[in-house]
Structure formats: C-alpha cells, structure tokens
Design a protein with these regions (language model features):
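N-terminal hydrophobic membrane-entry segments
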Residues: 1-195, 199, 203, 212-214
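Alpha-helical heptad-repeat coiled-coil segments that mediate oligomerization/polymerization in large
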Residues: 206, 216-217
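Basic (Lys/Arg-enriched) interaction patch that binds polyanionic ligands
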Residues: 209
Length: 217
C-alpha cells in the first residue's frame, strides 16, 4: 500500500488549458503542462494560488468566495465586480457596474509577482475606474462608455503586464445616477421634447400662413 501510494503521488494528470506550478523544498522547480506528468514524491509539491469562485446559496443570492487552488486555468476569465460609487467631475455620485475579461499568459509571474491576483485585479480596476470617471462630468460618463472602456483597458493592461496577465476587454454594464438626478434628467428630456414640438408646430403654422397668403395674392 505504501509503494502504491508513493507511485500515485508521483503521477499528476493536468487537463487541457491548465497548468500546475511545482516547488521543490519551497523553490520553483517546473510547470506541469496538459497531459501526464511525473514528479518526485516528498520533495516536489504543487503551489496553490488564490482564486475567485462565484457561488449561490439556498436563497438564490450570489456571493464571491476566494479559495486556494493548485491548478491554474489559462483560458479567458471574467470578473464581475459589484457596483461601486464614483464621484464625477461635477460632484455627482454615480454607481458603476464593471466587468473585466483577462487571461493568464505567464503562470510563473502570476504566482510569484503578486500575492493575491484576483484581489489585486479587482482593487486596480476599481481605483482606475474612479480616476477615469472622476475626470468626466455626468453627461460625459453617460455618453462616453467606449472612451472609459478604452482608457481602463490601457491602464489595466499596462499595470497587469508584470503579473503575467493580459487584459482583453473592460466593459461597463451599467451607470446609475442618483434618483433625484434621474428625475431631473427625465424632466429635462420631457421639456426638450415639448420645446421641439412647439417649434415644429410654430414652423408649420408659419409655413401654412405664408402659403395661404401667397395663394390669396
């Protein structure tokens, strides 16, 4: 039984698009790729990485759980962050819901260059979002989502390059102004539509009067 257990501990099967970082006495030894791999028992051990997992409880409420795992997924990942408050340049507090798509390109850097990769990516995305949206007014934030996405993508890609991570896309799911601001915007939009209707009606009556006068003449 001891011999069989030792033999089984030497064998590591890694799935496609996944890797395992192996350490020997606490020092990086090698990276196990997809397929059948052989390691030295006792001396070689897999290094765990902190990772985010979204779970749903009995009541149907989703929550994020960060747990250590030995396998590193090289496929494109998506982090859906909770809404956060951002103060715009005209001192309006809005809620922004963002999503981040990224992929681990260098598993060794992702393991050793940052202590907690998911937490670091989340904190960096939130602070960068506050900086970008804080330089814009409310109207600019509502009408310039592509600009915010591109600026965030540039900042995140440059900052995470040291961690062996490639940020592919940053998307803003929703921008929610305060309730009183929404009511004011609706009143403004309604007033603008009424003004346009009055102008069109006046222009129509004016044109009708001109044509009628020309006909009488």
């Amino acid at each position: 039984l001891i011999v069989v257990s030792v033999i089984l501990s030497c064998i590591k099967v890694v799935k496609q698009n996944q890797v395992i970082v192996i350490e020997r006495f606490g020092k990086y030894q090698k990276t196990l790729r997809a397929g059948l791999n052989i390691i030295t028992p006792v001396m070689d051990r897999p290094r765990a990485m902190m990772w985010r997992h979204k779970q749903t409880d009995i009541s149907g409420i989703e929550y994020v759980l960060t747990v250590p795992q030995t396998t590193i997924d090289l496929r494109e990942q998506v982090f859906d962050f909770a809404k956060q408050n951002v103060i715009t340049a005209d001192n309006v507090t809005i809620e922004i819901d963002a999503m981040l798509y990224f992929q681990i390109m260098d598993e060794k850097a992702a393991m050793y260059e940052i202590a907690n990769l998911p937490d670091a990516i989340e904190k960096l995305c939130k602070t960068s979002l506050r900086n970008v949206a804080g330089n814009m007014t409310l109207d600019q934030c509502l009408t310039s989502r592509d600009k915010i996405n591109s600026e965030l993508l540039t900042i995140m890609d440059e900052a995470t390059d040291k961690w062996g991570v490639k940020v592919n896309r940053v998307e803003l799911k929703d921008i929610t102004p305060p309730h009183d601001i929404q009511q004011a915007m609706e009143k403004q939009m309604r007033a603008e539509r009424e003004r346009r209707a009055i102008i069109l009606t006046s222009e129509g009556e004016k044109q009708s009067a001109i044509l009628e006068a020309e006909g009488v003449r």
